[in-house]
Every structure is written in structure tokens, then in C-alpha cells.
């Protein structure tokens, strides 16, 4: 029930009912005053919490900004460069959000606290002062009235008239105070309807403006997020392949002789103990020694292992270099130490006695110094009986495999990724390459299933005595794709292909043509160019040196294969440009190191356009809008091209964006589309089975087990998303933009209903198919300009939306 009205006429009567109604208004004003005090207190606590949150976010952002990624190897892929730069981009995004929050905090006191305090003090305070005056005049008036009424009628007339005049004045003062008090109370009650509510509305306006800014920043962040997600997918894919190769190398190292000599710069190197003669005997000091048999240079570096203090670790002194004259094994009975030998050098008189770590290690040093024995290497990867050759039987086998796959298995899910049973593969290889087998042996489809044939084809290529792309050109191919110039990568690989021997080039043409056909059916078999690169990269470009450094280049081997597949027609049907300079490892390594992060995708820094306040109602999404996501176009699960951006010809003037993309870019509203395959855009592998090295087969799984594993794989569980993805490839860019799917190749699983996902990027929420097909247009939101500029040019944390990613 509302407050009773106060009539001015009742002020003259001053009835108990009037006083009761007046008391109701006073109680309400007192309650309002207490509420405003509490509200101001809570508001100050909220502002303090916002300041603390802002400080914490800025500290977190600074930590991201200060961290520096370092990768193994002398060069980084575009994916690694973008990932290394991502923390700085995240920091920039957080700083931009905090810039808006700081504006909210700075304005909160003026918008919320000050107006409320002013209303409480000036309006409610004035009403309290009016009450004090009213109470004072009431008491004074009724006191005078009682005295006046107590006068005796026998008093003189002049005295009575004076008393009447005095009471009339007091009554008028009382009436004036009562009228002013009633007027002020009613004024305050009416003023609080707007002066009390307006500060709260203004504060919420600023708060929703901040939220709306975050909403728009999320839209601008969407293309970068998608590109970075593709980079993460590709890096994970390469990691799985490289890890298996490195693990196999570790096993071979473990199974090798204890004192094997790995290929390296020196003929022999390792720790030796050197005898140093003293006046009271001799000491043995550990040195790290190297020997180069070509120049006969022997180097000793004194090393001392500190076990504590600030110098914990290996302390190296400047090396001593000598030219070897002779090396003689030390007789066992001439010294009480084992494994010793003597050397003579030009720079010193007398002999230097050295102690090796074992008998076999001494033998290696002795053989190296007189040059009589070859270097011991790791166990051979292939036995002689396993080697295959580029002969007529090999070419016929490859052609038969390709014909069989293209005739009956081109649409098989996980083609070439899912291996056959090892025993069947070995039986196939034995029957085809047996000494008495005919050169034109056919592959019976009833005998050999598709998985066995594809595994046999990979096994043949893997077991070549020399990899198909040769050891001689291996480093040249690697350095070609390490270039920052997208066009140069393609042109350099093109030129190097024509330096291959004729048989190698012919076989490579045969294989890449087939892989190009396989990739064109990736909508069904899910074997994108990137997946094929991961499988065939280590097979076609096996490194001659079995080292960890060589394993780190597997990711670049995959890129070479991607370039060959994507540019098959150009590379194998057109002559290379004779003016293209071939890669030089030294120059490319230096240039890459100097600008290692300059090519990273980023959210361009720049000033942003200031905007007026958005009506709070416009910041609230309606029931049909995307309430929980900044964009319905979550990251696509996989385009049908290469995941990596390395093999795309971004700088080629002959390639342009798709018409649908250009149409959206000209629309003037915020409309991001997935880059077309013609651009240097993200190209994702589809969600199939776990990435596997091309040189590994599962010897334990049968065909049925593989099919069962595939049926429960993430790719199968996400089949609604896959079908949606494949269907949208032929649709407009608007539909592509609305596609919702998951990102991770290996660990991102999509539940039934396509509502949730988890994996390497857990923060990217997958939406349902119904939501994913919903248009991004929201009628309640104002159109977004292509670029926004802020008046405050000093703020460098803002960013404008990037161009095509």
C-alpha cells in the first residue's frame, strides 16, 4: 500500500491523523536514507573488487607478454611461429578488455557514488532539516499558545491585544514551517523516483557497454582463434609423428653397442682421463677430447664437474689443440691403470698418456687415430633382404596398388592412416617380390584387402635402399620449405623435383598423382592433404642421419609432401622456373632467425573508434539469439585442404578469394568467413583416428579390430558434424561461416547432439547443429564497422580486426 497524501490544508488543523500520515513519510525517508548508505557501501566494495580484478588480469596479461617460446631446431614452421606469438596476442586482447574495464571503474564513482551521496545529503538531508525546524516551531507555538490561553481575562486590554498579536505571529511561523516541511517531504518522495534511479541506470549502462565491448572483441577475435586452432591441430599432428620416430631412435640407440660412434663433426670424440705429472706423483684429470683424422688435430678441453654452490654444473676451460704424430697402446704391465694409450704431438715434447673409459672405447680411439677402421654406426634400419628397389617389379607393384585402391577403396575412411595386419602385409611383399614372382603379378582383390594393399605400398616405399626423394636432396627440400616466402617454397620444391633421378621422379609422379586423387575424396575418406603429408613425409624423405635434430625436421618433410600434393599439376606438368635460386642453408637459417616472429598471424594494433553508450536493452540477447557465444561460427572441424599454411601460395597473384567471401567483405557488417582454399588459410585435418607415423604399422590388430576401433573413434562419434562439414563445402560462405564443429585432431571428442567437446582446446565450445546453422545477424545490435578507431590514441592496447587469416 502506498504512502498517504499530505494536504496543505491539514497543516493548519495539525490533527493527529495528519501527524500519523506525516510520520509514515518520515519513516520512509529514513528507510531510503539507510538503503542509500548501504548501497554506497556496496558500490564502493564493487568498485574495489573491480580494481582488484583488473590488477590481477593485468598481472596475468603481463606474465603472458613476458614469456618467450623457444622451439627445437634452427627454424620454425609457420604454425610454431604463430603459436609462439599467441601469448602476446592473448595479452593484447586482455589489455584491450582491461582498458574498457578501467574506463568503467574511472566513471563508476562519478556515475554512481557521487550522485547517490548528493541525493542523500542534499534532498533527504534538507527534509531532515525541515523536520527539525518543524519540530522546533511546533514546540514553540504550542508553548506560546498555552501561555496565551492561561492569561486572565481581567488583564488590561492592551496586554491582551499584545498577546493576541504575539500568538498570531507564532501561529503564522508554525504554519509556514509546517507547509514548507510538507512540501519538502513530497518533493523528496517525487525526486527519488528519478534522482535515485538514474545513477543506477547510468552505472548499468556503463557495465553493459563494457560487456558489449567484450562481445565485439570476441567477434574480432574469432578469425584469429580459428587460425590459431588450426595451427595447434597441425602441431599436435606433427608431434605424434615425430614422437614415434624419436622413440624408435631412442630404442635403436639403446640396443646399439655401448661405445658406438654416431655420425658427427669429429672422427672421434668423448671423455678421456689425461695423466698430469706432479712432483709427488701424478693425477688424472678428465678432459673432453675430439679428433679429426683428416687434419690429425687432437683437442682437449679440461672439464670439472661442480656439485654445489653457484657454479653447479660443468665448467669448461679453453681447449688445447695439438697435431697428432703417433698413437701407441700402453702396455698393461707398464702402468697400474687400465685402458691406457700414449700419443705424441707436435706441440709438446714427450708423450701424453690417456685413459679411455673401457676397452672397446680405447679400441675406437686407436682405430680412429691411425685411420684403419671405419666409424661404428647405429644398427641398420633395414636388413638387406628387406630392401626394395626402383625396378620394373616395383613400378608394377605401385601401379597395381594404386589401381586397386582407386577402383574399390578410394572412399575408405582413414585410407593409408589405418594399417593392415602385419602378417598379411609381409605375405603380400614376399609374394610380389619373390625371386620367381612374375614382374606383372596382379593383386587379387579377393585375397588382398584394401588395408593390406595400402600398407604394402607404404612398406615398399619405406624399404627402398634410398628414400624416393634421395639423401642428396634431403637438406635442400627441407631448407626450401623453411623459407618465409610462400611462393618461393613452391617454386623451390618444383625445381628440386626436377633434380631427382629419372626413375625417382617417375615414381614420385605416380604416387603424388594418386595422393592428389585421394585428397579430392577427403569429404568421405577424411584424408586431407595434411593427413597425407603426415603419413608420407617420413616415408618419402627419410633422413640419412638418425639423430634427434633430424627427427625435428619431420614436420618440414610433411610440408614438402603437402606442397607436392596441392601443386601436383604445376610441379609435374610444367617446367620449373630456371631463375629460381636454390636454397642455401646458411642464408635461410640466418634470415629465419632474425625475423622468426615477424610472420605470425596477429590482431593488428591500432587506435579504435569511440562509440556512444549502447542502450542496456540492446546488450541483452533475445531468446533466439546466440546468448552464450561470441559467434556461432565456432572453429570448423576441418576444411578439405591442408591443415598447414606452409604449402599455400599466399603471395601468388594468380590466386584470389572466393566470390562468396568477397561478397561478405563488401557487405559492411561484421561478417567473417572461413578463408577459401585459395588463400593462405587454415586447412584442417578431419577428426579421424590418432595421428600415426607413416613408417609404423600395428602388427597386433586385425582388420576387424581396426574397424571396431574406427567405429568408436572421435571421427565416427562426430559423424553428424562431419556430414554437416562436408555438406557445407558446396554451399555459400554464409553457411560456411555458420558451421560449428570441434578442433582437435586427437583428443577433441564430440558428444551426441553435438553440444559439447573437450580436448586440447577445452574453451572452444561446440554448438548444436541447429544453433550452428543459425544466422549471425542479430537485429537488436547495431552494425559493426570494418574498422573502429578510438579517440584516445595513446591507448596502444586496442586492436582492429585483422585482414584475411
Curated annotation (Swiss-Prot):
The UniProt record lists the keyword Coiled coil: yes
PH domain: residues covered: 265-374
Gene3D superfamilies: Arfaptin homology (AH) domain/BAR domain, Pleckstrin-homology domain (PH domain)/Phosphotyrosine-binding domain (PTB), Rho GTPase activation protein
Site (Arginine finger): 417
UniProt record, GO biological process: signal transduction
Residues in BAR domain copies: 7-262
Keyword annotations of the record: Coiled coil, GTPase activation
GO cellular component: cytoplasm
UniProt feature coiled coil, ranges: 225-262
Compositional bias of kind Basic and acidic residues: 694-704, 782-793
An example Gene Ontology molecular-function term: GTPase activator activity
Region listing for Disordered, in residue ranges: 576-600, 625-725, 765-805
Top-level taxon in the UniProt lineage: Eukaryota
SMART domains according to UniProt: PH (SM00233), RhoGAP (SM00324)
Bias-annotated ranges (Low complexity): 626-654
Ranges of biased composition (kind: Polar residues): 670-693, 710-721
Positions of the Rho-GAP domain: 376-572
InterPro entries named in the record: AH/BAR_dom_sf, BAR_dom, GRAF_fam, PH-like_dom_sf, PH_domain, PH_GRAF, Rho_GTPase_activation_prot, RhoGAP_dom
Protein role: May influence blood pressure by functioning as a GTPase-activating protein in vascular smooth muscle.
Protein name: Rho GTPase-activating protein 42
Organism for this UniProt entry: Danio rerio (Zebrafish)
Gene name, Swiss-Prot/TrEMBL: arhgap42a
